[in-house]
Amino acid sequence: MEVQIFGTKKCRESQKALRFFKERRVKTHFVDLAQRAASQGELKRFAQKFGAEALLDREGRRFRDRGLHVAHVSEARILPMLEEDPGLLRTPLLRAGNLLSLGWDEGEWKERLREAAP
C-alpha cells in the first residue's frame, strides 16, 4: 500500500499522518500544498466523496483572514477557491488507491491497514 498525503509541513495533523505511516513502514508520497497546489481533478475526487463544503478548513486562520466566516460561499465557488488558495483546505487529505480520507483519523487508518494486510 502507498499513501499519498496532501498537507503542509506546518500542519500538525499532516505530521501525525506522516509519522503514523513511517512507524508502520508504509510508503508515503507527501504533497506539500505550500509548494504545489492540489490539482482540480484531485480536489474534485475528494469533493465527490465528502462534498466541497467539507474540504474548507472553517477553523483555520486563512478562512477568517479572508472574511469567509461571515460570507456565504456557494458550492460552485469552493473548488476554484481551494485551487487558488490551498491554505483554505482542511488537511491532511489522504489517498491510498481508491480509499480517501479527509482530516486525520488514526483509528480509521489502523483499520484500513489491518484490512490491507496479507
At which residue positions do the language-model features occur?
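Local sequence-structure signature of Cys/Sec-based thiol-disulfide redox active-site neighborhoods
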Residues: M1-R24, T28-R36
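Thiol/selenol-based redox catalytic cores and closely related redox-interacting motifs
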Residues: L33-P118
